[in-house]
């Protein structure tokens, strides 16, 4: 049964760059695509996000001589994990997965566009002061409850879920429609933070059975 019109599906970074063979592959990342496609028709409203980095982006290890991917450096806004080069603007790596099918999506939000600031969350950049405008866009359309899925659970999904709660939305993470990087315990920490913030968990099977 379709969910009410005050619900929206938020698909986080279902891009080639996070799939097997991509610049920053998440294990089994491609397994989420058919799950998202099956549950997408439950939603009248949907938003997709897209990591969209310039080649000079501060989060790329390649832009820091002597550093390796997954090193952590200090930036003016705090600790920054250095990543393999991924999702560079206009490249196939940055494209949405070709089999992703969410035709009712009303917005594609591109994030991580500024060279000197990373952006995991769909709502607020990593400096924690620059907002993307998504919360206001959703509030203006009467959205009250967000269902999150995508990549990766412990980074962009979790940061988006926490910021959505802070912005006043009910939030449910659809677990089987996500996969994690799990860097040094990051998945357990992310779930602890999300649980503390009141983020709910669900499965796509549960949603489809309701």
Predicted feature residues:
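Short glycine-enriched, charge-decorated loop/helix-capping segments at active-site entrances
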Residues: 20-28, 122-126
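Short acidic-hydrophobic, aromatic-tinged amphipathic segments that line or gate anion-handling sites
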Residues: 200-209
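Short, flexible loop segments at boundaries between secondary-structure elements
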Residues: 173-187
